[in-house]
Regions:
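Extended helical scaffolds that flank P-loop GTPase cores
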Residues: 163, 190-234
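Conserved C-terminal guanine-recognition region of P-loop GTPase G domains, centered on the G4
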Residues: 69-77, 97-167
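Conserved nucleotide-binding/hydrolysis micro-motifs of P-loop NTPases
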Residues: 52, 61, 84-86, 116-120, ...
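Conserved G1/Walker A P-loop phosphate-binding module
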Residues: 1-92, 103-105, 109
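Canonical P-loop GTPase G-domain recognition
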Residues: 144-201
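Helical mechanochemical/support elements of P-loop NTPase systems and associated helical scaffolds
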Residues: 60-67, 78, 90, 94-97, ...
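Residue-level signature of catalytic and energy-coupling elements of molecular machines
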Residues: 33, 45-46, 64, 79-81, ...
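Flexible phosphate-sensing "switch/lid" loops adjacent to ATP/NTP-binding sites
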Residues: 44, 98, 217, 221
């Protein structure tokens, strides 16, 4: 099939926000968490990103494999393949590992891989990851299957709604990977956090959901700050 078309950096599309921040020094290693649901092509993407430049170990305290790899063509970029999970609730060892990695190891960015054929289920984790306020890019995987089934996804509208770059890819066919890396490196280098999405504002500003959410946030704000956790995630 034909390659997946998508605007590259500076070629239009929604997500080209300039934060005004200077880029991180070239000596800084750009570390990325690769996160996503089970069976969404995450391991395939990790292999495409890193090739044979991989190291397999264990996360401390649990029998969960940890895979780290240097991104091909970017010697100063390191990707950690996190276990496949459906939420950030720390109920399983896999969820606990992912939560600890993002909150305690402070990656410079998150690559969230999403199954384009099952977006609704995948976006629950996406929204939780966005609340961590870490620079993030969404890899919309299996777009070749969507295309072959005659479907389409309005990627630019999705970017506008989420406030993060959304890059259509096919990890299995090695399509869109270079663009994904370009966007991931960009948001990490310039520390572009996800756009603030307050979906409880969908109706009136003073709606009940909005009032309840912000009342809770005011109660836990100090505790979240002490724990070093973004208040919306807490």
């Amino acid at each position: 099939g034909k390659p997946i078309s998508h605007p590259g950096l500076g070629e239009g599309g929604r997500y080209h926000v300039q934060t005004g921040r200077p880029p991180l020094p070239g000596s800084v290693t750009l570390t990325f968490a690769l996160a996503g649901n089970q069976n969404c092509g995450k391991t395939t993407l990790f292999n495409q990103l890193t090739g044979s430049n991989q190291h397999v170990g264990n996360f401390p305290g649990v029998t969960v494999d940890r895979k780290d790899g240097v991104t091909r063509g970017h010697e100063n970029t390191l990707v950690t393949d996190l276990p496949g999970i459906y939420s950030m609730s720390p109920y399983s060892s896999e969820e606990l590992v992912t939560r600890r990695f993002v909150l305690e190891e402070h990656p410079k960015g998150i690559i969230n891989i999403v199954d384009a054929t099952n977006i609704e289920r995948n976006l629950y984790l996406t929204m939780q990851l966005m609340e961590l306020d870490v620079p993030m890019v969404l890899a919309l995987n299996m777009m070749d299957e969507v295309r072959e089934n005659g479907g389409s996804i309005r990627v630019n509208e999705m970017e506008a709604m989420l406030g993060i770059p959304v890059v259509p890819i096919s990890a299995a066919k090695n399509e869109g990977i270079a663009e994904l890396v370009d966007h991931a490196v960009h948001v990490a280098k310039y520390q572009e956090s996800p756009g603030r999405q307050d979906f409880c504002d969908a109706g009136e500003q003073g709606g009940a959901v909005h009032r309840c959410l912000h009342a809770i946030m005011s109660l836990i704000e100090d505790h979240a700050e002490q724990a070093g956790i973004p208040v919306r995630f807490a």
